[in-house]
């Protein structure tokens, strides 16, 4: 082989080796880039379902040292998994209740444009809590606020704000309603909104901002619902609705709703004689409600809802320290767990309680005759023992010299347990305060705590003489 051939051969071999090295480096670069972008890649949805967004773990015996100078690395943010709520965690063990929120709506109305409201309640989604109320279609310092003591007018709408934000002029009007309930199923809000003629009202079911279903009055006598949050478990929401006499036999039905569509209706069964304005809470796998008997009992009805087979049972809270107003004094009040006590049963007020093993936590007005003051306490054996009256852990929420009103429960899911909270409606204006022509409210909110707590009173606090007439 002559020198020129040697040179050509060596050059060809070198070029081949260089080409192979280049291809290997290109393959390594492509592999590295692909692995980098796939490390935080979201899995492709299967069957239109949202899949978990997890990093891919790559195991290899290669140590890579990367030197970065003035380099910004942006990590892809994957969307959170949206799931239905199931409320399967246990109930938090508490020692009492601690202050959480107060909106001061009436005090602020003395110098600002705040809605006239009543029938407030609170409900939460995964991230925030919201306050709701039924507006009267007017602000307080407005001639339209005259005679707003009336419950049912076509101008009433359901208002919704973040908890602690008073209902100002920019407040969202969710729907037309003079009776309502709202709850979040984990994916979207459901609002049950009732409006129309007393003898032929309509309940609209609004889910994720859209009207999905409706139902008309079935007894032609003021179709009405809870005035507090409904409850959703695994995509099915349930709400208690009543149509019929407020002081006699009425027709109560429990509706089951999936993404705004009514999927089943169950009649009330069990021993409860009259049920309205229920305060419901998740008690996995079912739902439990504490209601108002406006006919026969000052002891509160209990409605147990089976979310799997749609069956219903009902009874009464066993505690002999009864929760409704008006009621007998504590020495003479009674409850046998099964039947209304026939003690000042006519009339009443929305309220709440919840079971804690054999015991019961409850709230009620301090006055046995009027919607004045508010207290909470635990009754030992109050859930299981007829006429139990051993009271512990009493707290004053509103002192007896100040007005209260409706109250209700809402549930908040924590990391390890489900906490129970409650709100108290602080009514002001007519009938008791005849200097003004309007009737409205503010709210105060407390939540269960496992810690210690002090004492106090949290009334509405507005000086009626400072208020617009």
UniProtKB/Swiss-Prot annotation:
The record's Pfam families line, in alphabetical order, gives: Neur
Required co-factors: Ca(2+)
Disulphides:
92-417, 124-129, 183-230, 232-237, 278-291, 280-289, 318-337, 421-447
Q: Where in the cell is it found?
A: Virion membrane; Host apical cell membrane
Q: What are the catalytic residues?
A: 151, 406
Which family does this protein fall into? Belongs to the glycosyl hydrolase 34 family.
Q: What is known of its domains?
A: Intact N-terminus is essential for virion morphogenesis. Possesses two apical sorting signals, one in the ectodomain, which is likely to be a glycan, and the other in the transmembrane domain. The transmembrane domain also plays a role in lipid raft association.
Instruction: Tell me how this protein assembles.
Output: Homotetramer.
Name under which the protein is recorded = Neuraminidase
Gene name of the record: NA
